[in-house]
Amino acid sequence: MALTKEDIINAVAEMSVMDVVELISAMEEKFGVSAAAAVAAGPAADAGVAAEEQTEFDVVLTAAGDKKVNVIKAVRAATGLGLKEAKAIVDGAPMTVKEAASKEDAAALKAALEEAGASVEIK
């Protein structure tokens, strides 16, 4: 019996955010695609300068939202900081939570913080 789209959607709905991030990464590798949104073409670069793909990202907490305690817990879990330091980051938003993270780590951290109720940007 083949899986239907509805079966797949229900299975994904039951997964944790980290499992979904891993699933997306596996699908990107398997099918050679990217889940990133298409970006409009910018001005052409000089022929002698090769465009470099960004490999390091900063995860910035822009707002804690209504569930501040959950966001503090998520920051502590992701960074290993103590309660006081994590609370200072959350209270001082916008603040950088993690610098020079890989694309996958940044996406996973963003997902975890958003699940906790925070607003997050990746730069």
Swiss-Prot record:
GO terms for biological process: translation. Belongs to the bacterial ribosomal protein bL12 family. One of its GO terms (cellular component) is cytosolic large ribosomal subunit. Forms part of the ribosomal stalk which helps the ribosome interact with GTP-bound translation factors. Is thus essential for accurate translation. It comes from Marinomonas sp. (strain MWYL1). Keywords: Ribonucleoprotein, Ribosomal protein. This is Large ribosomal subunit protein bL12. One of its GO terms (molecular function) is mRNA binding. Homodimer. Part of the ribosomal stalk of the 50S ribosomal subunit. Forms a multimeric L10(L12)X complex, where L10 forms an elongated spine to which 2 to 4 L12 dimers bind in a sequential fashion. Binds GTP-bound translation factors. The lineage of its organism: Bacteria, Pseudomonadati, Pseudomonadota, Gammaproteobacteria, Oceanospirillales. The keyword Ribonucleoprotein applies. InterPro entries: Ribosomal_bL12, Ribosomal_bL12_C, Ribosomal_bL12_C/ClpS-like, Ribosomal_bL12_oligo, Ribosomal_bL12_oligo_N_sf.
